[in-house]
């Protein structure tokens, strides 16, 4: 049984991410929520934060976004975001650079200090794993 769901992130610059994934955790405007294949259809606003993508091989990728919207169907998730930064890289210096860009992107879009601290903590913890 295929338990993967199609996921894409689109910004004004184009498609940032596209692929089949096991699950996605999104920064909803009312709190984080997870989506698996077969999820009920919904449309949600997203706040600045981190999208946690669990791939088929159970590895995780993080993408920081500023505000946007998510459209969820039973077999597809589409995120439309104003901006996005992929928090990964081939070496430590590239990861550090992308992490700094992600923090700057989120900081520029949010004035909620508690939300900023939680998001930065998630980014820092992901870098250590």
Curated annotation (Swiss-Prot):
This is ATP synthase epsilon chain. SUPFAM superfamilies: Epsilon subunit of F1F0-ATP synthase N-terminal domain (SSF51344). It is a peripheral membrane protein. The keyword Hydrolase does not apply. Its main location: membrane. Produces ATP from ADP in the presence of a proton gradient across the membrane. It holds the Pfam family ATP-synt_DE_N. Keywords: ATP synthesis, Cell inner membrane, Cell membrane, CF(1), Hydrogen ion transport, Ion transport, Membrane, Transport. The gene is atpC. NCBIfam families: ATP_synt_epsi (TIGR01216). InterPro entries: ATP_synth_F1_dsu/esu (IPR001469), ATP_synth_F1_dsu/esu_N (IPR020546), ATPsynth_dsu/esu_N (IPR036771). It is found in: Cell inner membrane. PANTHER family: ATP SYNTHASE DELTA/EPSILON CHAIN, ATP SYNTHASE EPSILON CHAIN, CHLOROPLASTIC. F-type ATPases have 2 components, CF(1) - the catalytic core - and CF(0) - the membrane proton channel. CF(1) has five subunits: alpha(3), beta(3), gamma(1), delta(1), epsilon(1). CF(0) has three main subunits: a, b and c. Belongs to the ATPase epsilon chain family. Signal peptide: none annotated. It comes from Campylobacter jejuni subsp. jejuni serotype O:2 (strain ATCC 700819 / NCTC 11168). One of its GO terms (molecular function) is proton-transporting ATP synthase activity, rotational mechanism.
């Amino acid at each position: 049984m295929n338990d993967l769901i199609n996921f894409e992130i689109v910004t004004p610059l184009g498609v940032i991410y596209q692929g089949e994934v096991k699950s996605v955790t999104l920064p909803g405007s009312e709190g984080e929520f997870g989506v698996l294949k077969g999820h009920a259809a919904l449309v949600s606003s997203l706040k600045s934060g981190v999208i946690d993508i669990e791939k088929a091989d159970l590895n995780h990728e993080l993408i920081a976004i500023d505000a946007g919207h998510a459209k969820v169907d039973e077999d597809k998730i589409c995120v439309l975001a104003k901006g996005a930064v992929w928090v990964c890289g081939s070496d430590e210096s590239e990861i550090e650079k992308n992490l700094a860009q992600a923090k700057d992107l989120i900081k520029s879009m949010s004035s909620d200090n508690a939300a900023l601290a939680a998001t930065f903590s998630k980014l820092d913890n992901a870098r250590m794993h």
